[in-house]
């Protein structure tokens, strides 16, 4: 069993590769991809992504390919067992969360309920 399977949230190779490209474009190697959950959206909660150059007390950091994904403790409790991925398709390119804790999700996949 690898260390990756023990993590509460997976950070896919595709997501890490895209983060690496975006950070290189910004020319700031201290940036990390932060995933968070806020109230809102059509299903009650919604996912958010931003680049952040700091890690707060209690944040979980997951590193892959020399880049980091950061999640605050409150958001992590809703994301345990999930994954952060990057897709390109007819709907455009975007980071997506696969969340096994979501009972319902909206059509675009950016909001959910538990």
Swiss-Prot record:
GO terms for molecular function: 2 iron, 2 sulfur cluster binding; 4 iron, 4 sulfur cluster binding; iron ion binding. Binds 1 iron-sulfur cluster per subunit. Keywords: Iron, Iron-sulfur, Metal-binding. The keyword Protein biosynthesis does not apply. One of its GO terms (cellular component) is cytosol. The keyword Cell membrane does not apply. Its cofactor is iron-sulfur cluster. GO terms for biological process: iron-sulfur cluster assembly. Iron-sulfur cluster binds at residues 42, 106, 108. InterPro entries: FeS_biogenesis, FeS_cluster_insertion, FeS_cluster_insertion_CS, FeS_cluster_insertion_RrpA, HesB-like_dom_sf. Pfam families: Fe-S_biosyn (PF01521). SUPFAM superfamilies: HesB-like domain. It comes from the Bacteria. Required for insertion of 4Fe-4S clusters for at least IspG. Belongs to the HesB/IscA family. Homodimer. PANTHER family: IRON-SULFUR CLUSTER ASSEMBLY 2 HOMOLOG, MITOCHONDRIAL. This is Iron-sulfur cluster insertion protein ErpA.
